Amino acid sequence: MLPPREVVRLAHATGCTLLALTDHDHTGGLAEARAEAAALGMGFVNGVEISVTWRHRSVHIVGLDFDIENEALQNLLAQVRQGRLKRLAAIAAKLEKKGIVGAYDGALALAANPEMVSRTHIADYLIQAGHVRNKAQAFSKYLGDGKPASVAHEWASLEDCVAAIKGAGGLAVIAHPMRYGFSATAKRNLFEEFKALGGDGIEVHSGNCDKNDRLNYALLAERFGLMAGCGSDFHRLGDYSGGTLGACPELPPDCKPVWASFQTA
């Protein structure tokens, strides 16, 4: 896992001039990232990616350009992080019933930030302990929906998430909407509800999505009166499940970029 300053340096090396660091449910790296961006002459805005439950489905909402000291936002993020630990304990208890011990402590030991522990870290522990060969098997055998160690989890509500971001003076953007596998009806319902709650935009490009995705979501952004975001979805070096740092192509014509509304960049 790269420290925030290294992420900023890598972005700078790609020619990136404006950056938002959007760790999941945590803002602890923003001060370090902002200082490094300033030293390199880059624009920087505060960011965070918040886990949300919407109609029993998991959705991620990116908050941008907000006041990091806002108490309501920080309280919401703390609640989400505490929920991760509660879920880990429940999963570990189910695994123990299957004869797999040590998952709680093992997953925490593998997480760079214990507050940000996830099923991926549990999968890493299962691999390390020799219970499965790879992450795919960890999810298909134990951790996936409906499997023996599956634990449903309620993240923040969409309403509370958007309210917290807006209350902190920020912009709320739906992250990587092309990755959820939603039907056309579900997408319409999500975008309409998000807009009605005060949401600002959707990511028109994210990670490794293709040109057709960009054009499709640009049209959807225009249709629902939402601004367009663009993110690389970079997670770590060598992890190709996201995207390449700094790889954000130009937005399709007629998009209103979310960064045009930034106040602190």
Question: Could you tell me what each predicted segment is?
Answer:
Residues 1-57, 142-144, 156-239, 248:
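An N-terminally biased module of ancient metal coordination in phosphate/nucleic-acid-related enzymes
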Residues 36-192, 254-258, 263:
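Extended substrate/RNA-proximal surfaces in nucleic-acid metabolism proteins
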Residues 232-265:
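Catalytic core of soluble alpha/beta enzymes
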